[in-house]
From Swiss-Prot:
It comes from Shewanella oneidensis (strain ATCC 700550 / JCM 31522 / CIP 106686 / LMG 19005 / NCIMB 14063 / MR-1). This is 6,7-dimethyl-8-ribityllumazine synthase. 5-amino-6-(D-ribitylamino)uracil binds at F22, A57, V58, E59, A81, V82, I83, F114. GO terms for molecular function: 6,7-dimethyl-8-ribityllumazine synthase activity. (2S)-2-hydroxy-3-oxobutyl phosphate binds at G86, T87, R128.
Amino acid sequence: MNVVQGNIEAKNAKVAIVISRFNSFLVESLLEGALDTLKRFGQVSDENITVVRVPGAVELPLAARRVAASGKFDGIIALGAVIRGGTPHFDFVAGECNKGLAQIALEFDLPVAFGVLTTDTIEQAIERSGTKAGNKGGEAALSLLEMVNVLQQLEQQL
């Protein structure tokens, strides 16, 4: 039986982090978590990490698509925070952001890790950006590292 599964070390991986500025006090913590994970666990060097800042979560897919189209990266991490308010705006932003990022992964055959918080309250967002519910930026980086390795193995074996 042949089993393909990734590990989290990817020393030579070139990673782009596309991050929204909206809710910056939260997303900066997500960025710290992602960078720490990439460097400490993935052994990814600073020169192999590019950070792209965009205004908000709606702009993440377009920037990620441009990064993917460049062909210079092994994977993309998308970071942001969308918090439900009193209008349906949350549903549109969260849904379109998620759908757009998933489409890029499939279109370019490139791992795109979803580190965009979609929460009902500010408290939930704070919990997921480095306090008692962990750091979703770090978790997105772990997922990306593993998928970079899985895809490399599949390319070699198939």
